From Swiss-Prot:
Complex and partners: Interacts with IL13RA2.
A GO BP annotation: immune response
GO MF term list: cytokine activity; interleukin-13 receptor binding
A Pfam family of this chain: IL13
Residues bearing attached sugar chains per UniProt: N38, N48, N56, N71
Gene3D superfamilies to which the protein is assigned, alphabetical: 1.20.1250.10
Annotated Gene Ontology cellular component terms: cytoplasm; external side of plasma membrane; extracellular space
Protein name: Interleukin-13
Main location: secreted
Keyword check for Secreted: yes
Disulfide linkage: C47-C75, C63-C89
Protein purpose: Cytokine that plays important roles in allergic inflammation and immune response to parasite infection. Synergizes with IL2 in regulating interferon-gamma synthesis. Stimulates B-cell proliferation, and activation of eosinophils, basophils, and mast cells. Plays an important role in controlling IL33 activity by modulating the production of transmembrane and soluble forms of interleukin-1 receptor-like 1/IL1RL1.
Family, per entry: Belongs to the IL-4/IL-13 family.
Length: 131
């Protein structure tokens, strides 16, 4: 009986170790959200109204956003965001390559892209779809 009880306790403990644990949010993703909030709070015209190509944030959002923002020059406000996106982007776009995530016919202001990215990343963070 004692042996049987020991086996049951051991299996219970091992079962607890094998059970799936909750997915913890990426600290980088949380930092990105905080940075995007900081950028959008007091910026009526971010980067002097620079325009960037609109991107499809549902397909490779970090790389697509980075690729769109990488061509913005003389805008220190988004440099930290660019570094964070580089860390989150698993693929490096080739020079001169036109991404499938980018819509070449639509340009939007940098502030609008940042707001769109913030909305999308908040949703990803909220629903736990970490990539």
């Amino acid at each position: 009986m004692a042996l049987w009880l020991t086996v049951v306790i051991a299996l219970t403990c091992l079962g607890g170790l094998a059970s799936p644990s909750p997915v913890t949010p990426s600290p980088t993703l949380k930092e990105l959200i905080e940075e995007l909030v900081n950028i959008t709070q007091n910026q009526a015209s971010l980067c002097n109204g620079s325009m960037v190509w609109s991107v499809n944030l549902t397909a490779g959002m970090y790389c697509a956003a980075l690729e769109s923002l990488i061509n913005v020059s003389d805008c220190s406000a988004i440099q930290r965001t660019q570094r964070m996106l580089k860390a989150l982007c698993s693929q490096k776009p080739a020079a001169g390559q036109i991404s499938s995530e980018r819509s070449r016919d639509t340009k939007i202001e940098v502030i609008q892209l940042v707001k769109n990215l913030l909305t999308y990343v908040r949703g990803v963070y909220r629903h736990g779809n970490f990539r």
